[in-house]
Amino acid sequence: MRLILASSSKTRKTLLYRICRNSFEILPPEIDETPLSSEDPKNLSERLSLEKALKISELNRDAVVIGSDQVAFCDGKILKKSNNLNDAFEQISWQVGKQTTFFTGLALVRNGGKEVQSGTIVSRVFYRDSNFISEKLVRDYVYKEKPLNCAGSTKLEGLGICFIKRVETEDPSALMGLPLIKLCSFLKKWNVQPFA
């Protein structure tokens, strides 16, 4: 059974490698990630995960396709992926001393979309306050890490972990963009051995 990761994310590729080694392919989907009118962050992450997997599954009906998407939500607003370093600086500064909720959607699709498993991991991340996170620290982080195209501009797999006071999650890998614990459960339901 072919296994395909529907993503262009290097971090998701690295995470999937942890449980599948080289037994998967990568095919990045092209979808519109714009939120629908009044769409909440949980539904957005679930919808985008499913759309990514379905897009790739249409042309790869013999494969199990993995789609995942992450949405950050802080103080009443969805934090879109930063397009430039200035946006990233503003996003990190916005989260100082606050709680950000990360919704990491996961979808597995096979048979061209006839069979689907999907779900969302909700993680709460508590950022350190301004006594710890200075403007200079944020600027240095943005310059060194270049956190573009990641939810909330916080690369928790890298230097972004320095901003964090505490995390509440059932799946630590979800915070990096691909919930491996849930993925292993989904694969098992379809009798797919991840590290075969």
Locate predicted features.
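N-terminal beta1-alpha1 ligand-phosphate binding loop
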Residues: 1-21
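Anionic-ligand binding patches
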Residues: 3, 40-196
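Cofactor-binding loop segments of dinucleotide-utilizing enzymes, especially the Rossmann-like FAD-
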Residues: 8, 29, 111
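Glycine-rich, flexible loop segments associated with nucleotide phosphate handling
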Residues: 9, 25, 136-138
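Flexible, glycine-rich phosphate/dinucleotide-binding loops
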Residues: 12, 33-35, 115
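Short loop/helix-cap segments at secondary-structure boundaries that form the rim of catalytic
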Residues: 15-18, 36, 58-59
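Glycine-centered loop/turn motif at secondary-structure junctions
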Residues: 20-23, 191
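A short beta-strand-loop structural module common to alpha/beta enzyme folds
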Residues: 24-35
